[in-house]
């Protein structure tokens, strides 16, 4: 039995293991596995002439598409596929094939080693250098045609898919930074508005909130310090136990975070509502709030003095535990009673006073007698102020209504002016279109006239040249004719003198010359007619030139009309701007009217409440009795409005990160 127990204890004792040797063995085995996988893939590539390492990014792409379809929907998955496809096509078209294969293979192997648990260390860097050297020295030059054509799309995908993932990662990083920036801005705004709200609270509530915060911070610090001490003392044992309790802790932390988020949302909504109300209200609202706060302070002071009297009496009568109870009863919540609870509260206090001794009754009576007149004096002042505020608001309302009527009349006049201007603008546009059509026709006619003028000028020049040539020929013919006539006369004279044999030949010659002269005269007449026609055409051309001057006048008139239309358009745009400004002013006036009406209703309600309270106080005044036998006073406590005292502790969180409004 002893031996058996000894053996069991020996077996139960944990064996010490050297972690350094385990790390070395595991790392060497891992890198040997990488080398074996790499060698097998290279062998398969060499034997089958296909690069199987390109299928790994394709498999990753299919997994990412499936995950996007499962978690983000069909639209995002289709968009992701389209983006990856376009990036693959760009890499396929614009990257040379050798560099494409080199970059794809090196990226695949480097990424495969990068995904290990070791990270960047000496073995991984050495493997990367080996892969890059083999790819650059051996495989960069050995490319076959069938191998290239089949594997090129997969190589393009090996580069295009990482580019797409990097782009999405960069986009998510930028959106995360922008979200953090927005959260910081919203946190600053929330802190600012939280400080405003804390400053607006009464000092008692501020002190209570500070104490609550200090206690919460102390508890949180104590919990964190206790956790750190436990971790430091226990070491690995606690670390081993932590994963077991992590789900419960996460569940509790999630519940706390959700509750805090809800509270922060409610506080942020309340803060924003208060902010909108304070921004929309103007100087009159500020004055009203000051008066309201002054009245509240007066009521608090009066109520505090009366309660302090009762507390002092009860402290004098009771023991050390009584003040705390009465202090709790004298909290502002005790004053939030209705009219039906007045007799019960007065009877309770009278019973307590009957139990107490008769010490210090005279000063208490004096103080209570001074309390009610002060309250009576403060409330009519508030009524007077409220009536003055109502008168001011009514005057402002009438002024805003008059302004609204003036604005509406101006809007109607401007709308009528706009209609007339639009009609005039339409007429001017029609006239402008007609003038543009006339101008277009005139320009076309002018171009045609210019073409005809150029042709006629060419004809005129040709005719003038022909006329000059004909005139030269006529002059030469006349000279020749004169010479011939002279020679003929001489010859005739000589022939007549010598012999009369050449008369027939001379007669025939004379006939020929006469016929030629007739032809020349006929040609001269034709040329003169042509010259007259050309002169008529030249006159027509002069008329066309005069018409060009008329077209220039029309152009100047058209430009003037265009300037006028542009001026009218500018004036119309200015009037539309004025109308928009007037509409915005009308909207502001309506908002001010609504705000003023709401304030008037609120103040009327407050006046009614104050009148009711004054009537109640006046009715309660004769109820104060003095008994000579018991020397006890049974006053009725003054009524204070529970509306002006909100003692609910604020649980706003100034460290709110993001404002999230409620969705309706």
UniProtKB/Swiss-Prot annotation:
Ranges of biased composition (kind: Polar residues): 644-658
Gene designation per UniProt: Maco1a
Chain ranges passing through the membrane: 28-48, 75-95, 120-140, 154-174
Top-level taxon: Eukaryota
Keyword Transmembrane helix: yes
Native source species: Danio rerio (Zebrafish)
UniProt name for this protein: Macoilin-1
UniProt biased composition (Basic and acidic residues): 210-219
Localization (cell): Nucleus membrane; Rough endoplasmic reticulum membrane
Glycan-carrying positions: 234, 336, 339, 348, 655
């Amino acid at each position: 039995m002893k031996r058996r127990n000894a053996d069991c204890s020996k077996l139960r004792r944990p064996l010490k293991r050297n972690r350094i040797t385990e790390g070395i063995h595991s790392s060497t085995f891992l890198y040997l596995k990488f080398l074996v996988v790499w060698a097998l893939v290279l062998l398969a590539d060499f034997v089958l002439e296909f690069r199987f390492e390109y299928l790994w990014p394709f498999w990753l792409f299919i997994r990412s598409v499936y995950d996007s379809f499962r978690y983000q929907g069909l639209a995002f998955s289709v968009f992701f596929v389209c983006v990856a496809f376009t990036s693959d096509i760009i890499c396929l078209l614009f990257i040379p094939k050798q560099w494409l294969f080199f970059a794809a293979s090196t990226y695949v192997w480097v990424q495969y080693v990068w995904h290990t648990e070791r990270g960047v260390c000496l073995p991984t860097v050495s493997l990367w250098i080996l892969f890059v050297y083999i790819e650059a020295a051996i495989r960069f030059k050995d490319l076959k045609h069938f191998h290239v054509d089949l594997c090129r799309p997969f190589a393009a995908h090996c580069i295009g898919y990482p580019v797409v993932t990097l782009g999405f990662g960069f986009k998510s990083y930028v959106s995360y930074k922008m979200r953090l920036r927005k959260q910081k801005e919203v946190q600053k705004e929330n802190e600012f508005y939280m400080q405003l709200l804390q400053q607006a609270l009464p000092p008692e509530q501020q002190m209570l909130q500070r104490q609550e915060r200090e206690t919460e911070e102390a508890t949180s610090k104590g919990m964190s310090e206790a956790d750190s001490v436990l971790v430091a003392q226990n070491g690995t044992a606690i670390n081993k136990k932590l994963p077991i309790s992590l789900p419960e802790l996460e569940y509790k932390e999630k519940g706390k975070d959700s509750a805090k988020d809800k509270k922060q949302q409610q506080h942020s909504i309340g803060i924003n509502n208060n902010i909108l109300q304070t921004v929309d209200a103007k100087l009159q609202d500020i004055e009203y709030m000051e008066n309201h706060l002054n009245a509240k302070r007066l009521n608090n002071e009066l109520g505090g003095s009366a309660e302090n009297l009762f507390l002092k009496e009860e402290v004098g009568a009771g023991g050390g535990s009584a003040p705390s109870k009465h202090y709790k009863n004298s909290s502002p919540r005790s004053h939030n009673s209705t009219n039906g609870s007045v007799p019960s509260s007065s009877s309770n206090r009278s019973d307590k006073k009957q139990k107490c001794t008769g010490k210090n009754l005279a000063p208490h009576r004096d103080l209570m007698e001074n309390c009610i007149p002060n309250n009576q004096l403060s409330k009519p002042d508030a009524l007077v102020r409220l009536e003055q505020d109502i008168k001011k608001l009514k005057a402002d309302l009438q002024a805003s209504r008059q302004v609204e009527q003036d604005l509406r009349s101006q809007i109607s006049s401007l709308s009528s002016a706009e209609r007339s201007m639009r009609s005039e603008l339409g007429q001017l546009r029609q006239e402008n279109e007609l003038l543009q059509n006339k101008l277009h026709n005139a320009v076309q006619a002018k171009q045609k006239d210019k073409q005809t003028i150029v042709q006629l000028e060419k004809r005129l020049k040709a005719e003038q040249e022909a006329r000059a040539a004909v005139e030269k020929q006529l002059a030469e013919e006349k000279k020749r004719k004169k010479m011939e006539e002279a020679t003929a006369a001489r010859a005739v004279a000589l022939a007549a003198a010598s012999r009369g044999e050449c008369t027939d030949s001379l007669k025939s010659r004379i006939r020929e010359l006469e016929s030629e002269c007739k032809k020349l005269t006929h040609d001269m007449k034709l040329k003169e007619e042509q010259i007259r026609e050309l002169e008529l055409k030249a006159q027509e051309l002069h008329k066309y030139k005069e018409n060009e001057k008329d077209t220039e006048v029309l152009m100047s008139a058209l430009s003037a009309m265009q300037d006028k239309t542009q001026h009218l358009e500018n004036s119309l745009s200015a009037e539309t701007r004025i109308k928009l400004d007037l509409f915005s002013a009308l909207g502001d006036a309506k908002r001010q009217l609504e705000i003023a009406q709401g304030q008037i209703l609120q103040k009327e309600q407050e006046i009614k409440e104050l009148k009711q309270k004054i009537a109640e106080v006046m009715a309660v005044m004769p109820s104060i009795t003095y008994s000579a036998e018991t020397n006890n006073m049974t006053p009725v406590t003054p009524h204070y409005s529970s509306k002006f005292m909100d003692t609910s502790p604020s649980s706003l969180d100034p460290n709110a990160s993001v404002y999230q409004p409620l969705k309706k």
